[in-house]
Every structure is written in structure tokens, then in C-alpha cells.
A protein has these predicted regions:
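Divalent-metal-activated hydrolytic enzyme cores
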Residues: 2-23, 27, 59-126
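Surface-exposed, active-site-proximal loop segments in enzymatic domains
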Residues: 5, 46-57
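Glycine-rich phosphate-binding loop signature in dinucleotide/nucleotide-binding domains
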Residues: 28-32
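Structural motif
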Residues: 34-37
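Short, well-ordered beta-to-alpha junction loops that form the rim of enzyme active sites
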Residues: 39-43, 85
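Short catalytic/ligand-binding loop motif for oxyanion handling, primarily in non-cytosolic enzymes
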Residues: 44-47, 89-91
Length: 126
């Protein structure tokens, strides 16, 4: 991408973030990871929403998009899911745990009320 990752004091962390993302992809591919569950709203791991600016400020701002590591995982062929994709995670649990039934009321993050009100529309890469 074209974005930069800046630390709380304005230090450019982009190169380190890319280095970490590359390491994450190599490790995931070596371990034959098929699905990564990552923390959304993160400059590294956001799958739908990322911080706009430093995450340590009193009032955070957000934008639609994917984090550095998420973008690299997607490019490496690894599916990424947000920890807030409750419906998808519950459906996966149904497959892994006989007898578990996902609630029909669960929603994935793109359907969350806050997400819909503050950042309408889906990010094309998510």
C-alpha cells in the first residue's frame, strides 16, 4: 500500500511493520495456516477497519481498510477473519464442536451497528 504507520511520537514504523508482516506470512505458510483470526482496528491486523493515526490518543479515529500484516496474509493466500466476526467464528465452532449451535442473532463485524453507522460500506479487500 501507500500508507505509513507512525508511532505515538511521529516515528515512522512502516518498515518494521512490513518486516513483521513478512515474518508472519512466512510463519503462517510454513505452519500451513488456512485462517488467521486477527484483531480488527489495528494498523497491523485490521481486516476491515484500521486506526487513522496513533492508537494511543485519547480519542481514536478510524477508517475502512486492512492492516499491513492482514494485506500481506491475504496476498499470501491466507484467509483473515476479525475477532469481531462472531457469526463466522460461531459457524466454524459448529464444524469443530459437535452439538454446538450458533445463534442466528450473531453478526459479523461488517453488520455491527457501530461499524455500519461510522464506516458504511465494505472495504474491497476485506
Amino acid at each position: 500500500g501507500r500508507g505509513k504507520v507512525l508511532g505515538e511520537h511521529g516515528v515512522d514504523l512502516t518498515a518494521k511493520m512490513i518486516e513483521g508482516g513478512r515474518a508472519m506470512v512466512l510463519h503462517a505458510q510454513a505452519a500451513r495456516v488456512e485462517l488467521a483470526i486477527l484483531t480488527d482496528m489495528s494498523a497491523a491486523c485490521g481486516s476491515q477497519v484500521i486506526s487513522l493515526g496513533c492508537r494511543l490518543v485519547p480519542v481514536r479515529k478510524f477508517q475502512k481498510g486492512v492492516g499491513v500484516a492482514t494485506a500481506m496474509l491475504l496476498e499470501g493466500g491466507i484467509v483473515v477473519c476479525s475477532q469481531r466476526d462472531y457469526f463466522t467464528l460461531a459457524k466454524l465452532r459448529e464444524r469443530a464442536e459437535p452439538g454446538y449451535v450458533a445463534s442466528a442473532e450473531m453478526r459479523d463485524y461488517q453488520e455491527d451497528e457501530w461499524r455500519v453507522e461510522n464506516l458504511p460500506g465494505a472495504h474491497p479487500r476485506a
